[in-house]
Amino acid sequence: AYLARIEQAKSNTVHRSQLACGNLAHGFAACQPEDKASLKSMLRNNIAIITSYNDMLSAHQPYEVYPDIIRKALHSVNAVGQVAGGVPAMCDGVTQGQDGMELSLLSREVIAMSAAVGLSHNMFDGALYLGVCDKIVPGLGMAALAFGHLPAIFVPSGPMASGLPNKEKVRIRQLYAEGKADRQALLEAEAASYHAPGTCTFYGTANTNQMVVEFMG
């Protein structure tokens, strides 16, 4: 049934070459002149970029510069790239024990729907999904499957460099639990462990999902 749906989408989905002129003009109004000319001519593929960038979460901060890098790479192969939409990204490491954690699983569906909104404009010939971590990758995966007639590639953000060794972090936590280290010492240890952009420095769901999409190609 799914494959039949995708075949139907291939034949029934309106391609940008079939969009009304007003629709198409809206779709490339903000593009650079060269990209605008390419999209007018229909001679080059247009690739959607769906990004989960935010600069609060270490795993998603690197995506700030990805769209420009991707556009340059696409230009080198005579294609165009547009950021079609952004999706939310949250971290259980921040919300754990707080009310915000109640939104964690729900965010997967929100991410899928947010990506679908961006792809719904029918301007694209393929899609790149910029996301990592345990709710973001599944949400983007759901969107990629819903738009399975568009070739898709997932782009992980990469791991955080190793910081404070886990044994040392555990030692400081134990001292804090025993009342032998204060909150400032504990915070310094945690900050030395999670200390830079990239996915968390342990084998958790962020790195697991990153490896899954890389293994899948």
Predicted features by range, described:
Residues 1-217:
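Metallocofactor- and cofactor-centric catalytic cores in central/energy metabolism, strongly enriched
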